[in-house]
């Protein structure tokens, strides 16, 4: 299965290059037969939504889920993707997050579009080298997409 109408709606306003990568990654994901669907959790964010997410774990209840008020989501240069089965996100399944990372990096390489993953902030191919891992997050790097 590829992207749903809901996923495509969530990609509205996202930079076309990133949409190209996500669409190709979804096609690759579908061939893996993981039993999980790939969903677009979030694309473009409003400043209000970003402020609410930033407050989480700081001045509002919950755990910290973002480290900046200057998110690439605000400009349509980022997406959050999640593997889901029976309505449940596979948060604890490292293998699925690694598979998603591989799908995205393969799709980006094929399209010759640079991406930065929340699992690999410095883009060196080594995932989770920092404590601020954000497995669902993929963005177009500022140095290529100001």
Where are these regions (language model features)?
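Active-site acidic/histidine clusters and adjacent loop/turn architecture
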Residues: 1-42
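Short, well-structured alpha-helical interface segments that form or flank functional binding sites
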Residues: 20, 48, 99
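Extended, low-complexity, intrinsically disordered C-terminal regulatory tails
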Residues: 26-60, 110, 120
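Cytochrome P450 catalytic domain signature, combining two hallmark sequence patches
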Residues: 57-69
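Catalytic cores and adjacent binding grooves of peptidoglycan-active enzymes
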Residues: 68-146
